[in-house]
Amino acid sequence: MNQQVKTRNLKKKNTKPNDIVDKKKQGLRNRETNVISFIFVALFLMMASYLVYFNVFEASTIVNNPYNKRIDNLENKVVRGNILAADGQILAETDIDEDGNETRVYPFSEVFCHVVGLASAKTGVEGVANYELLSTSGNIINQLSDDLSGEKSVGYDVVTTLVPKLQEAAYKALGSNKGAVVAMEPSTGGVLAMVSKPDYDPNEAPEMYSEWLGYDSSDSVLLNRATQGLYSPGSTFKVLTALEYVREYPDYENYSFDCTGSAYVNGGTTIPCYNGSVHGHQDLKLGFANSCNGVFSTIGFRLNLSKYRQLCEDFYYNKNLDIGIESSVSSFTLDENSGVSEIQETGIGQGKTMVSPMHNLMICLLYTSPSPRDMRRS
């Protein structure tokens, strides 16, 4: 009896370590399985997140890249959609003849040439909305059917905020002068009109484009001076000069200057007021209201030039506007090494300070906005 008990106890002692080892192995397997499962789930979520990000934020940019060969494939499968004005008038459409040959047609000819752009060069709206114009709403079955039958799908139409009557008025007002006119809706930032001259007839692009490319930059018809031309901002820049002064001097209401019709600073330049106007005693508000060059050509000497520069860069001077269409970078050059004359000239928006008409208007829109706005979305 005692021997049986001992034998039974011995068996229990002998089997227990094996059970423990098996359980440890099983636990280790479960842990490895969980780790592998976690890795696969994490990878799947990362891929899914990237696909969502790509389709929502990057698809248009990638597809519109001129090096993306997919564009060529889309143009072979999709008839480019129309570009419409705010009232529905057609600004660009695709004409198809009996033989199936496609021609991009611009009904308003020169009037909208720069803002609508060229489909062949991917400029203006033609470039910004290239992805949408070549995208279709058809389902996969319809697309496969079109591919098999050799028929093309039709791309989306793109509706702009452009107003033909305003565009034509701006075009007529600019006449034969070189320059640009831009009009925007303050509450939304929508572009209502954009004219640049010299201009061109986009319907002649197939035959004339190579010749246009050869024009001197000063006479270039392809240059959109509304976004790519750089000009002195003039008195419109005094807003930024005044703003920086107010930021640096809480007692700005005590500012005082006696205008004699011009201002001179030792080592600098004599800066006259417009038409030699003598404004007399000026505080900051009066100086701003009178656009007194005497006030603003001297006020820069009281400013911290690094802070002045930072303010201007906050308004996208020395930065890309990132507005979709082709644009030049506006310049503000003052720094600690700037000379007296340059500081004088910059204070009144002259000298080396340069801005595009579009950029200047976007800044002006911020003054009229009742709430803060990202200038890139003005």
What are these regions (language model features)?
Residues 367-378:
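Single conserved hydrophobic/aromatic residue that forms the stacking wall/gate
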Residues 49, 237, 358, 375-376:
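Residue-level micro-sites within transmembrane alpha helices that shape
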Residues 175, 246, 373-374:
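Solvent-exposed alpha-helix faces
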